Amino acid sequence: MTTGMRRALLCVCLASGLAGCAIDPTRLPPGATRAEALQRLGQPTATYPLPGGGERLQYSRAPAGFEVNDVDLDASGRVTVVRQVLDERWFPVDIQSDVWREADVLRNYGRPFEVTRVSSFDGVVWSWRYKLMNTPRFLYIYIDPQGVVRRWHTGDDLTTRYWW
């Protein structure tokens, strides 16, 4: 590879990296307007009303990705909080077993990576992929036939591990 080709490749890589940073939702400053959020981040994958007249813009990289970013706006349309919600620190704080319903799960985490059934539970298990220090993991939320969250847990994604 010639020096010119290496420089061109380096420029493309740097430009791609900077473009990726420009659309990182966590870089959106508090107080930004809804219009600014949409201009910087594009159309959200979902929107949800919040108490008090606010709105949640949800940017999910699922099913292939590992992040779901929630951008919360107040009633005046200004950003109050931006949070990457697929984070083990937040699961025990956010998930409310025996209280949350499907709509609460969707409003917080978006559409799941996968919906399955297991013989030990009468209902469905929704799962999301995320990373813990670059280790692929799953969040599993168990929803009963009435649409109520009954329990949740995390687990390693063993399909991506390499055992030598």
Predicted regions and their residues:
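A cross-family detector of function-defining hotspots
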Residues: 26-78, 97-164
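Beta-turn initiation residues at beta-strand->coil junctions
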Residues: 83-84, 154
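Bacterial N-terminal signal peptides that target proteins for export
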Residues: 1-10
